[in-house]
Amino acid sequence: MMGLGNGRRSMKSPPLILAALVACVIVLGFNYWIASSRSVELQTRIVELEGRVRRAAAERGAVELKKNEFQGELQKQREQLDRIQSSHSFQLENVNKLHQDEKAVLVNNITTGEKLIRDLQDQLKALQRSYSSLQQDIFQFQKNQTSLEKKFSYDLNQCISQMTEVKEQCDERIEEVIRKRNEAPGSRDLAETNNQHQQALKPQPKLQEEVPSEEQMPQEKGDVPRNKSQIPAPNSESLGLKPQVQNEETNEIQAVGEEHQQASIQGQAVADGTRVGAEKLDQHTQLPAGLLARPEEDSQYPEREQLVIRDRQEQQRASEEGGGQKNPGDEYDMDENEAESEREKQAALAGNDRNINVLNADAQKRGIINVPVGSERQSHILNQVGIHIPQQA
């Protein structure tokens, strides 16, 4: 019941509920108005924010494009930088390698140069030592040369004096032989001319057979002794001469003595016979090569050449003196004189042939040169050696 009583009480207060409800509606409307105004503001703000977001997105897209462009350029620059770095590193390696090679070459050159300098210094020292030894040798050689020159001059003076003595002895022997031959009777001269005529008619043997050897000459001609024993042997070291030179000199002296003997035998020949002999001498004369081809060798022995020339001049004078004597056959009649003149011509021809053979024997020792007959050179050389050739008519 009580409950029913409370219900009745609530039914009795509706204006309060309505007022409360109106107040709630007013409050809710105000709240709605406020919320709607706020929502409108929020919507405007959302629209603004959306616009901002769209602008930001557009700006972001542009920024991203620029970023992409910048990234592409950056990538290109990085690639270019990498290429530059790689080329730089390659060039740097090449330059370093080249520098290393040059350094090695320079070091090698320096080592070889130092070695060469050391070798040259050693060679310089060796050359200095050899130079000092050569100076000592030169000094010793000069001393030896002065002593040898003194010795040579002394030996040369001795040799010259000995040669003059030998020449005087030879001249005395030759004069003795000529005097003996001139004092011989005319019959002996006539017999000798006949023997020479018979020898001239025989065929002429070889040159080596006509020239007597050194052993046969003193035996056949006893008036001219061997001069080899009279010549003392000079010092071969100081003069620098071989023993063959002494043998040649003795052979020449012996040949000159034999020529003087033959000249004394042929001294009584007529002038016609001498002309015939001169003609044959012009045809067959051969001169020694020492007079033409070897003047230097002859200039080393001037005393020997002068001795031979003087002996030949004396032979020429002796032959002229012998030719000036009268022939005992001139006292005969004309027929006998003609026969004797023929014999004397042949004898003179044989004597001239022997003289030519003697000259050829002398020429064989030095070498023979054929000179044209009648040339000026032939006459000049024959005059030097003391041979007088009369001119033909």
Curated annotation (Swiss-Prot):
Q: Source gene?
A: Golm1
Gene Ontology biological process terms, A to Z: nucleus organization; regulation of lipid metabolic process
TM region(s), chain numbering: 13-35
Task: Return the Basic and acidic residues bias intervals.
Answer: 294-320
Q: What does the UniProt PTM comment say about this protein?
A: Glycosylated.
Name of the protein this chain belongs to: Golgi membrane protein 1
Its annotated function is as follows: Unknown. Cellular response protein to viral infection.
Subcellular location(s): the record lists: Golgi apparatus, cis-Golgi network membrane
User: What is a single cellular component term in the Gene Ontology annotation?
Assistant: membrane
Keyword terms, alphabetized: Acetylation, Coiled coil, Glycoprotein, Golgi apparatus, Membrane, Phosphoprotein, Signal-anchor, Transmembrane, Transmembrane helix
Q: Which residues form a coiled coil?
A: 40-183
Where are the glycosylation sites?
Answer: 109, 144, 227
> What family is reported?
Belongs to the GOLM family.
Looking up InterPro entries in the UniProt record yields:
GOLM1/CASC4 (IPR026139)
Which organism does this record belong to?
A: Mus musculus
Region listing for Disordered, in residue ranges: 180-247, 284-352
Biased composition, Polar residues: where in the chain?
Answer: 192-201, 227-247
User: What is the annotated quaternary arrangement, including any partners?
Assistant: Interacts with DYM.
Q: Which regions face the Cytoplasmic side of the membrane? A: 1-12
Question: What causes induction of this gene?
Answer: Up-regulated in response to viral infection.
Its membrane topology: Single-pass type II membrane protein
Q: Locate the Phosphoserine modifications and list their residues.
A: 187
